[in-house]
């Protein structure tokens, strides 16, 4: 019996690379290679970009990693879930980090994970069923 292959890969990436100060050209090359391997096995990709958390925001070039991810996603035909921008909007709208980040300043707490999970699920459903966005009836042709 052959193992089932992944149809969709959601790759949470960028946070550790940014913190470890991986040069962005190397980061981009690793993204391309990973997507190429997965696509060669028949998987579709969604890149989930880095987290907007104190450990990342303190870096001098955190937005450069988000930019590189967007470029590679477009180049490789992968989806991009903009977690960085979503979390930044929470913070800019007055939500304190403590409400969605653990005490280590790096990882999402249960509330943050739940919110990101729901938004990601809705994004995937909207991508595979655009009629959800328009309210049009979902009738087969």
Language-model segments: which ranges?
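Alpha-helical cap/lid subdomain in secreted, periplasmic
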Residues: 1-141
């Amino acid at each position: 019996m052959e193992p089932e292959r992944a149809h969709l890969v959601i790759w949470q990436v960028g946070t550790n690379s940014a913190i470890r100060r991986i040069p962005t050209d190397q980061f981009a090359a690793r993204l391309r290679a990973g997507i190429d391997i997965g696509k060669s096995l028949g998987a579709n990709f969604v890149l989930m970009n880095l987290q907007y958390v104190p450990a990342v925001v303190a870096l001098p070039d955190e937005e450069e990693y988000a930019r590189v991810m967007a470029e590679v996603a477009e180049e490789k035909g992968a989806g991009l879930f903009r977690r960085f921008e979503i979390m930044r909007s929470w913070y800019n709208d007055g939500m304190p980090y403590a409400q969605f980040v653990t005490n280590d300043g790096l990882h999402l707490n249960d509330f943050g994970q739940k919110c990101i999970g729901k938004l990601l699920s809705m994004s995937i459903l909207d991508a595979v069923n655009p009629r959800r966005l328009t309210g049009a009836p979902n009738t087969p042709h």
